[in-house]
Amino acid sequence: MKRFAATTALALLGAALSLHAQSEGGIEGAKKFTLHGSIQSDVLTAVSQDNKIGTGEYDDKFMTNTYAELNLLNKYFQAGARLEYLDHPLPGFENDFKGWGVPNFYVKGNYKWAELTLGDFYDQFGSGLIFRTYEERSLGIDNSLRGARLALKPLKGVNIKLLGGQQRYYWHHRNLDNCSPWTWGGDLELNVDQWVKKMDENNTRLTLGFSGVSNHKGEAESTISRLGNTGETDPITDKPIMGLYTLNIPKDVAAFDVRANLQKGNYNFLAEYAWKSQDPSSSNGYIYKRGKTLMLSGSYSKRGMSVLLQAKRSEDMAFRSRATADKGTNACYINHLPAFSMQHTYALASLYPYATQMTPGEWAFQGELAYNFKRRTALGGKYGTNVKVNFSHIRGLGYDKSATTETTSTVFDPKAETETVNYPFFKMSNSVYYQDVNVQIDKKVSKLLKLNFMYAYQRYNIKVVKNESGPIINSHILVAEGKYQFSPKITLRGEAQYLHTKQDQKDWWFGLLELSVLPNFMFTISDQFNAHVPMSTSDGQIDPSVTNKVHYITGSVTFTQGSHRLQVGYAKTRAGYNCSGGVCRYVPAYKGLQASYTFNF
């Protein structure tokens, strides 16, 4: 089936390219359609084992994640398909990713105020607290739904979405282990300002949203057997009887979301609340607890200044289409909780990235102030100075010990009101999960030279975020970046970074040089150094008693021509986490030759 689908996709690619050529040649009928597509191929080869950085031994000497996508559209119709080849996936992608085929295809039609999609699609309700499907290839995320989506705009200011389907789970959508989950949902969004003339005249925008999602898990997951406390007591010893017990997993899990977004002039306020019914799964340890999330956000912006304040409280909001999905993977999440921590782009500032703790939950706060000191002032200088301060603080939920119940048989009854732990709404734990305070300064010194500086102080709870033993990591990070333009075609950019900590692997240094030669070439070399990298044994175990001084050197050449981009280089990378939007994937250390090719048309 996969071979047939792949062959069909390639045939469509050839036919589409032919159609594109005909359109360019002037055939009148073909001009009504537009063809868009892309090819992306990332390759790692010539890998070698290095116990100093813990690469382990790779069975595959040639690894690639390759995607080819086509979309054909006109005013009323759109169709597309994506071919994926991951038979030998890149490091960090679990074995379930192995395979190739056409896992994504769709047709879409729209007329006046209605739009219908059949096949695979992505969408989001509100901020995604109860529903978000999206693709993030670097993290191995594709939780699209295969089914139908209907979007309606029947009246002015009214937007309606109705959808349903089966979620992608690696290469499967249904009948995996006799389990075929179905997800249904609807969203209503009202733009009140379009009905009230005075609001529009006063530059006021008010949007109200209401969403609902239901997930039917399938017959195979209606009961799950587990080993533990059966809830019965031995009459002789008066101790709990340990053994196999059966969990009655709810066949249907419902979630609801309400939100309001008010914009008035330079001000913007958002309030959103989500609720989820009892949803025992591997993510929360199979407890019967209702999920809740409250998110508040306020911002103010004007020319030269902006302020952002956010707060979020989430509790047991891991919403997945399959209850037994591995907790350590990103597969089959129906929802997404926005990250309330800054997503750093500098290498050492992102050395300890934070992953949102969906279970048991978290309190998260973020604030940001950006200010532009005007030109020809004491702090602005000749060209002005941009300063940005960001603060994020995330900690655990506090619980009421007096309300904590014993683990008895009632805990495993989905209809029981008893919950294992009670978390009072305003109570916070003493455990800090993550904290980041950073200051960035961007300064244009002259027409040819630009400088950027950053200082960050971070606290990272390795036990909570990575489930590893160890103390909280306190780190100080300094970054200096400069960009100098030698000529209209030649620019040199450099980075110098330093991270100081007394925990984990102690201090890190990083340096980078990047030479851009327009319009085609870019040359990059970087080195990340640490003097306390623990040795890895031949069987993959870490020996902390033996450490090494290691240079993680990376070099590449990038060639760009039109819509083609080819990058070739050598990489020696440390083990770590690749994160985006509070979602992370572990990537093991590796050493080898890399190549990346992209083409868009």
Regions found by a protein language model. Give the residues of each.
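Sec-dependent N-terminal signal peptides
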Residues: 4-14
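Outer-membrane beta-barrel proteins
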Residues: 90, 94-96, 172-178, 276-289
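Short acidic, glycine/serine/threonine-rich loops at helix termini
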Residues: 129-131, 173-175, 220-224, 320-322
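Flexible, glycine/proline-enriched loop segments at strand-loop-helix junctions
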Residues: 135-137, 171-178, 244-247
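Short, flexible helix-coil linker/hinge segments at the edges of structured domains or between repeats
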Residues: 216, 221-241, 329-346
